[in-house]
């Protein structure tokens, strides 16, 4: 599973720990019974501003180490944003703070779950 914008890290104990942080945020949505999503961790090849990427409706997400290092709240916003792309195929929406193209608003856990749930209900 590759992308041209993020270079995958090879799996190791350290990478597994990073990946676990991403998966823990996915588990915060387990009440919605989401499909299995493949998760890769890596580093941006070109733009340091890139925090994550998803294959639209293909249930694959890439999260950068930089996003993980920005803390739990930022990481949750990035993970939920990429999940909307990966699961539902929905593109950016500047009117929704979760789905803006740039991470301008950092949402609380409750607000992230609330916005994600709206997409889940819309597409299920």
Each model region followed by its residue ranges:
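Metalloprotease/metallohydrolase-associated module, dominated by Zn2+-dependent proteases
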Residues: 4-73, 90-124
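Short alpha-helix carrying the canonical HExxH Zn2+-binding catalytic motif
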Residues: 71-87
């Amino acid at each position: 599973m590759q992308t041209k914008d993020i270079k995958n890290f090879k799996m190791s104990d350290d990478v597994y720990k990073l990946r676990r942080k991403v998966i823990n945020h996915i588990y915060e949505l387990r009440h919605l019974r989401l499909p299995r999503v493949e998760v890769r961790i890596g580093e941006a090849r070109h733009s340091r501003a890139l925090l994550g990427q998803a294959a639209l409706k293909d249930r694959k997400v890439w999260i950068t180490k930089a996003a993980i290092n920005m803390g739990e709240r930022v990481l949750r916003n990035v993970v939920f944003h990429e999940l909307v792309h990966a699961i539902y195929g929905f593109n950016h929406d500047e009117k929704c703070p979760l789905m803006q193209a740039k991470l301008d608003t950092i949402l609380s856990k409750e607000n992230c779950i609330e916005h994600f749930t709206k997409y889940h209900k819309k597409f299920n």
